[in-house]
């Protein structure tokens, strides 16, 4: 939110992508409390009239922030400063069920390349392997959040060599995972 605030102070605009349309009401509510009414909403569930009205507000410069699903990436914002992609790991950012097919993350990266000085933030507690590998190669800048929002400890992570597991057992799960699942179920906990 602070980076968005900084962008607006510099008279730049922002796009915030969420993976699902169902997440837009709570996102709009949160942003409206902080940034007021200069926010537009774009997604495929809007009526043609609603979509037209939002595009017109954006085109007139009445909007600083566009929030929506992947199609919001095409908003005609002027002076773009930042694109935030929440839950970057979500498959919802890939449009592959109809033409034109595109990956919203790749499109966002291309859009900021065309808008000199603009930035992309890929937010995720569980980034894709591709994004994580790019961060390790310093193509992306990785920011670790060592503390969860709710102050709960981070989960313990165990790497299992599945090549070895496939030699030992049949099936698609490691013995360690199967044992942990059995342990949780025996305590009537969710898995």
Show where each model-derived region lies.
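Motif I (Walker A/P-loop) of helicase-class P-loop NTPases
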Residues: 1-5, 108
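Post-Walker A helix-loop "phosphate-sensing" segment adjacent to the P-loop in P-loop NTPases
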Residues: 7-14, 36-38, 140-142
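Conserved Walker A/P-loop ATP-binding site and its immediately adjacent core
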Residues: 7-31, 50
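Switch/connector loops and helix/strand junctions flanking conserved nucleotide-binding motifs
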Residues: 24-26, 49-52, 75-76, 91-94, ...
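Conserved motor-coupling elements within RecA-like helicase/translocase cores
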Residues: 29-66, 74-80
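Flexible beta-alpha connector loops of hexameric P-loop NTPases
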Residues: 39-48, 90-102, 163-171
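SF2 helicase catalytic motif II
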Residues: 57-122
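Conserved interdomain linker/interface between the two RecA-like ATPase lobes of SF2 helicase motors
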Residues: 105, 110-191
């Amino acid at each position: 939110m602070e980076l968005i605030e900084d962008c607006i102070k510099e008279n730049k605009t922002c796009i915030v992508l969420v993976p699902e349309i169902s997440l837009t009401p709570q996102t709009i509510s949160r942003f409206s409390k902080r940034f007021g009414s200069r926010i537009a909403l774009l997604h495929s569930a809007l009526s043609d009239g609603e979509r037209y009205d939002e595009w017109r507000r954006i085109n007139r410069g009445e909007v600083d922030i566009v929030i929506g699903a992947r199609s919001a990436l095409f908003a005609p914002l002027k002076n773009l400063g930042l694109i935030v992609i929440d839950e970057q790991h979500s498959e919802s950012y890939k449009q592959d069920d109809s033409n034109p097919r595109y990956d919203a993350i790749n499109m966002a990266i291309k859009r900021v390349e065309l808008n000199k000085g603009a930035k992309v933030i890929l937010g995720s507690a569980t980034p894709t392997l591709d994004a994580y590998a790019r961060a390790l190669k310093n193509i992306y800048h990785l920011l670790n959040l060592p503390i969860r929002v709710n102050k709960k400890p981070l989960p313990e992570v165990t790497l299992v060599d599945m090549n070895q597991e496939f030699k030992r057992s049949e099936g698609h799960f490691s013995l360690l995972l199967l044992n942990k699942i059995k342990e949780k179920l025996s305590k009537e906990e969710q898995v």
